[in-house]
């Protein structure tokens, strides 16, 4: 067996949401930049479509035909697929507007899970900081994953160009999201921590408005 996984493939891909209502959930604390999402497949009108679930099992969106095909091929080769949330965006078009986002996708041989997962975890940290490493590289890059234990590509990928009617809403982890993630790591109970923090923030705002004499 080779000591390097040359079958690795990494790329960024857009995903869309079913509706404006469900898409708005991406702005909540259960969908944080750098989080892992599960890729799974559904058959729709004879076509296989790759979908996404967050770490709480909630379906958040789906990929287009081209990306679905790439992921289906990786799945057919028994590769492990990891998806990390790269950003969340909103567009006015098509009417009445839609939430969408981008995932950093990694496909690799599970025999190399230790090295590959460590690399992907480092990329997740970079995404959380608002840094988008270029994950589409050749053999030399793959070899660095196995020879340099802390390696992350220095080359980065830009966000989509700003346009009228389009905005990136979330492209890094906020202070509050970092606190929530720390709570998750301590196994306190993800939902409890998330909602407790939100309640505290709302209460603080209400208190500040009250002190200002607004109510």
Identify the role of each PLM range.
Residues 1-215:
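Conserved active-site motif detector
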């Amino acid at each position: 067996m080779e000591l390097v996984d040359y079958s690795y493939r990494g790329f960024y891909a857009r995903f869309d949401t079913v509706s404006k209502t469900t898409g708005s959930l991406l702005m909540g604390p259960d969908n944080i930049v750098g989080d892992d999402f599960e890729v799974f497949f559904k058959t729709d009108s004879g076509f296989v479509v790759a979908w996404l679930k967050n770490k709480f099992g909630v379906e958040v969106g789906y990929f287009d035909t081209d990306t679905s095909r790439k992921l289906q091929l990786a799945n057919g080769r028994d590769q492990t697929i990891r998806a990390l949330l790269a950003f969340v965006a909103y567009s006015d078009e098509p009417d009445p507007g839609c939430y969408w986002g981008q995932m950093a996708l990694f496909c690799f041989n599970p025999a190399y899970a230790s090295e590959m997962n460590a690399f992907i975890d480092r990329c997740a940290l970079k995404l959380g900081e608002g840094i988008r490493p270029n994950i589409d590289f050749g053999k030399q890059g793959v070899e660095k994953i196995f020879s340099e234990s802390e390696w992350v590509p220095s080359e980065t990928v830009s966000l989509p160009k700003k346009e009228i009617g389009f905005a990136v809403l979330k492209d890094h982890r906020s202070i509050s999201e970092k606190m929530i993630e720390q709570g998750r790591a301590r196994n306190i109970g993800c939902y409890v921590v998330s909602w407790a923090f939100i309640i505290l923030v709302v209460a603080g705002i209400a208190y500040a408005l009250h002190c200002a004499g607004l109510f």
